[in-house]
């Protein structure tokens, strides 16, 4: 058997059925073996989109997503997508072609140091030097990617290794693999759990801060039981959105720079903060000196490197969130729980102050109104939102959705949180739809982010993948525009995108149905049509470019929420004639 065939067998042994990729010279043996395989390969139109799609697949399913590229520029094009997965602990297997082993280091055509390139942005990476290494390497890669704190793993595949022969009976795919030094701790220390339970039971103003680790661990049910048993309000990070139903009376919404008033004030006023599967990023804490200043902090995380990294923990617990929460609840049941009613009254008061105004009839459309109508349409189609997945891009579109859209289920709100990658949302939606074909998958994106991977319209058209793309079209890089208006004297530098393209015509040119929404009274009807069509569909929503969310200034206190300044766009664009004049003047000086 050839090495390339062994790679296919190894993928099949891991339960992989669908991969995303783009072929090239250094991966030709693999693609030749793929021809006779039952694996489904989705040909994206850019390697970055293959990585994002594999990431979206992983986030929606909880399984490892697989992306493939050739060597050199194919590998470099994967980098942004793999770095995105790494920042958000998403299990992606990235396969890259490589020049033959005897040419490595000779600057051969399309050679690049793939190991060095991927090392800082992967949980682990391998370069296979002999065909007989394939079975064990692939088993190890999937084990590492999907256990402990998940993350991407890269495998570099020299062309001669793919072409080489392997005796699969002599070198079978192992059921288990020995990984010296890799022993993720999944069960929390009993003494630490006992201490945490006592602190929670005696607390007067507890708050839970739930991060993406709750979703990764599958601990949403345990979180709900804990919150309801002790009556603890729950706020989430962006990555934790969906781990706790946001229509629950104890739900506070997202905390941080773009968080809700209820969440930010509750964290600031609490006396015990139970942080689960979160890394206390700067966007969550603001000024650390004033973050939960009166609270004892319990920090639960499977990665010991996160404990104490950004915020000091009074009771650190290293372990899998599901296991720790189960044991914590068992310990609490045996204790007398102090009454929390006074605190809950304060929480409900904060929640009343946080109710947003969303029912705007303005034109251009306010994003809040679109999100409100989207929620109503989706709840009508899927009342518990069990079969709905939202992906967002990065920028204002992400924050409007995080702030206003009430998520009810884990793995139903997919966003690039750590790296903040524009261009993530649309290809991630492709991966999510492939992973969950019966879910309604809606890609919410800004016009800037959409244009970074708009070529994937060809992919959804070619494979008939019924994703609904909703573009928040304000012809502006909205988040940068908002910051420039707030912090840079309204000097709007390079944030206006101009009038092209016509997104409806662009989609139609790829064979994708499309429509434009310019009035609030069109939103529901056109959304329903798009979602129920079960076809690839693009909606171009013309929104108010000057609309912005309140926010906490960078490095500010969570309670220092600044109202945005409404500033109309001041478009300043040099035309090509001006550019030519500048170049002509430079040429005269050189002469």
UniProtKB/Swiss-Prot annotation:
Annotated residues for binding of FAD: 149, 258-279, 301-320
Catalysed reaction equations from the record: 2 pyruvate + H(+) = (2S)-2-acetolactate + CO2
Keywords: Amino-acid biosynthesis, Branched-chain amino acid biosynthesis, FAD, Flavoprotein, Magnesium, Metal-binding, Thiamine pyrophosphate, Transferase
Cofactor note: Binds 1 Mg(2+) ion per subunit. Binds 1 thiamine pyrophosphate per subunit.
One annotated GO molecular function: magnesium ion binding
A cellular component annotation (GO) from this entry: acetolactate synthase complex
UniProt xrefs under SUPFAM superfamilies: DHS-like NAD/FAD-binding domain, Thiamin diphosphate-binding fold (THDP-binding)
Enzyme class: transferase
Ligand binding (thiamine diphosphate): 47
Family statement drawn from the similarity comment of this UniProt entry: Belongs to the TPP enzyme family.
Pathway stated in the Swiss-Prot or TrEMBL entry: Amino-acid biosynthesis; L-isoleucine biosynthesis; L-isoleucine from 2-oxobutanoate: step 1/4; Amino-acid biosynthesis; L-valine biosynthesis; L-valine from pyruvate: step 1/4
Protein name stated in the entry: Probable acetolactate synthase large subunit
List of residues binding Mg(2+): 447, 474
GO terms of biological process kind: isoleucine biosynthetic process; L-valine biosynthetic process; sulfur compound biosynthetic process
